[in-house]
Amino acid sequence: MTPEGEAIIRYTLRNDSGAEVQLTNYGAAIVSVKMPDREGRMADVALGYKHPEGYFFDGAASGKSVGRCANRIAFGQMTVEGKEYRLEVNNGVNHLHGGTKNFANRIWESRVETNRVVMSLVSEDGDQGYPGELCVEAVFDFDDDNALEITYLARTDKTTVVNLTNHVYFNLAGEGSGSVLDHE
């Protein structure tokens, strides 16, 4: 459960090689990616938290989908079609990743379709200061060649700013195995 009492759902996608990806509807997040190395040993290569509570106060947005606008907007100000908008300043003097209540810190609606999970949310006109209602989908596909693909789809009713991404971090030697500088 989130601090607001919303249910967190975990999904697991497995393929024929035994690899698996775990996702959660909190932040449309990748929480685990278990893959075989070149000797066939399985390791979780996605950096994340063992318990959902770790994601509630994670400034790095580990594994989560961020937006409305990934990255910074200088001084929390932007102009769209000649109109100036003021956004929350949440990173020094700048607006970062859509504000403190950005998409990474929300429950997404979710459904399973074959070997994919589709997560969606609606950001109302004026949400976090942005113009236009924005309907977003994040589609997570995982195939038998161990390819994980995230497709973001966005639809709006006004000209607006949208820049979605995922903040998953990897250690190809496996989580907890030390520095990433020795990857081969």
Set out the residue ranges of the language-model regions.
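An exposed, glycine/acidic-rich loop-and-rim segment of catalytic or binding clefts
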Residues: 1-184
